[in-house]
Regions:
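N-terminal leader/auxiliary helical segments
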Residues: 1-181
């Protein structure tokens, strides 16, 4: 989660393992944003929404992952999200915005709630309010609903490739960051 909240260069302000995870998160973002299946999925959106389709797709893919979690992970989703919330609660130093929302995130099970498509309405509305020009995502949820099946197929093709990439990168970054000497 740190990767969504820590911006700019990493200069030792976080523990080495956290900075390694942030760097991995950033490499995953680059991989995702440039992947042909991601580009194909974005092209499904109406022209007027295509510029912001990556945001909508990210939210939708989070929904797909939560809904189909058992297809991609051995650990049940409630156990995984519970561990995430415990780590956040025990962490004395979180990025400022994450520290503000972590208690509510845990209390309302934000990560697990993505299973429900209806939750995406609140998520998209919240993101839209934070954009420099609010209103750009209006109609985005209806478009996700309309494109549900083809985008789900895009996710099912893409996610195993993302898992493979992340596993390779984790192996590389552990060595690069000096964890396995």
């Amino acid at each position: 989660l740190y990767g969504d909240f820590v911006k700019g260069p990493l200069a030792g302000q976080w523990p080495a393992d956290i900075e390694a995870a942030i760097r991995l998160h950033r490499r995953i973002d680059v991989f995702t944003d440039s992947h042909p299946l991601q580009l194909q999925a974005r092209a499904r959106f109406a022209v007027e929404r295509r510029r912001y389709s990556g945001i909508l797709l990210d939210v939708f893919f989070d929904h797909c992952l939560a809904l189909h979690w058992a297809d991609y992970a051995a650990e049940p989703l409630p156990r995984f999200t519970g561990r995430v919330y415990q780590v956040l609660a025990a962490e004395p130093r979180l990025p400022e915005r994450l520290a503000l929302i972590a208690p509510r995130m845990a209390a309302q099970d934000w990560l697990g709630s993505y299973r429900e498509f209806a939750v995406l309405e609140q998520v998209v509305a919240g993101i839209d309010r934070r954009l420099s020009r609010p209103g750009l995502l209006i109609g985005g949820l209806a478009e996700l609903e309309r494109l549900y099946q083809p985008l789900l197929e895009d996710f099912r093709q893409f996610y195993p490739e993302l898992q493979d990439f992340a596993a390779r990168e984790r192996g590389l970054s552990l060595y690069q960051d000096g964890f396995h000497k």
